[in-house]
Every structure is written in structure tokens, then in C-alpha cells.
Amino acid sequence: MKVTAAFAGLLVTALAAPAPEPVLVSRSAGINYVQNYNGNLGDFTYDESAGTFSMYWEDGVSSDFVVGLGWTTGSSNPITYSADYSASGSSSYLAVYGWDNYPQAEYYIVEDYGDYNPCSSATSLGTVYSDGSTYQVCTDTRTNEPSITGTSTFTQYFSVRESTRTSGTVTVANHFNFWAQHGFGNSDFNYQVVAVEAWSGAGSASVTISS
């Protein structure tokens, strides 16, 4: 979730409101987790066996959604994707997203975003260079907020790509290793997904995951 809003209902599956256009994500094999924190804020459909999902949201979104597909247990393996992502005027991310169980942490590797950079309102940890670009790295502490274990206090880690892109390979290990210098557990992973998140404006995306 964005730094300035609580992330609730991580394990909730909500029916989606109909909308005219999709966000599409696919992976050839291995998908075994659906992230569906939607709350009827957009049109979310998926086919887990095919490794595809769609999401489209219209103006009027005033709360947070995070949807995506991935794996019940995350890893530091690289993820290759390509996307057609449109979030002009929307507070939104296209990111690798997940959780670490202990110490409990929520993380984002933000490849592209709309009109809000999460590192603009968080504590800077510096920068890391990976996959042809510098990433801003920042952290925030969420106190008594909803999490994967209920209400808890946990750390958020963000790497935000300066040269935003919608295709390429994310060398996840580069980010995990950098964050580990600042308290990230880098083990005992919970789920990990390629995700679309938004909490204002309108947008859509089309993504293919190939690793």
C-alpha cells in the first residue's frame, strides 16, 4: 500500500465491479497465488491456471486496491515481465510486491508509477543501481496497522526506479540484499506478486510475466 494509507484485508477476495477495459498479467507456469485486495474499486478478473489477470479502474477510486498474481512463497529469483501500463493522473504503482514473515516487512520494487512516488514521504536509505537504472530506496514504519497477521507493527521497504519502465528483468536479489543492510530479513518469505495498486484516478495495464 502507499506509505500514507493502511493496507487492510490482504487475504480478502472481493467481487469486482464491471468496467470496460482490462489490465492483463500472464505467466507461463508456476502461478499459485492470487492477490485480490480490491473492494469493488475496479474490474478485476483472473485465470490462475493460465497465469492471467485483468484490472481496470475509473475516476472516483478513493480507497486503496492491490491486485496481482504470483507465488505463495516469494524468493530472490529474477522476474522478467513486459507491460502496457497507463496510470496518468492516478496514484498507482506497477511493482513486484510481497511480504517477509520475520522480521515482518512489506516490500515494493516499483517499476513505474502514476503521480505519487512513495519515497517522497518516507525515510531515505540511499540508492541502489540495478537493471540499468538507479532506484531510490526508502523505508517507513507502520504502527498498529492491518497486516498479513492481523494488526501489527511492521516495516515497509521501497525501491523506486528513477528511469521508469514497463518491461525488463527485475533482479530481485539486488534489492533484497540492499534492504538487508537496513534490517530486512531476506528470508522466511510470504507471498510475492507482480501487482497493480492504485488509490485515486483512473488507469489500466497489460502485463506478461515470463520468468
From Swiss-Prot:
Which reactions is this enzyme annotated as catalysing?
A: Endohydrolysis of (1->4)-beta-D-xylosidic linkages in xylans
* GO term, biological process aspect, one: xylan catabolic process
User: What's known about how pH impacts activity here?
Assistant: Optimum pH is 3.5.
In short, the EC number is 3.2.1.8
Recorded superkingdom: Eukaryota
Which UniProt keywords are present, listed alphabetically? Carbohydrate metabolism, Glycosidase, Hydrolase, Polysaccharide degradation, Secreted, Signal, Xylan degradation
Q: Where in the cell is it found?
A: Secreted
State the protein's name: Endo-1,4-beta-xylanase 6
Per the UniProt entry, what species is this protein from, by scientific name? Aspergillus niger
Give the gene name. Answer: XYN6
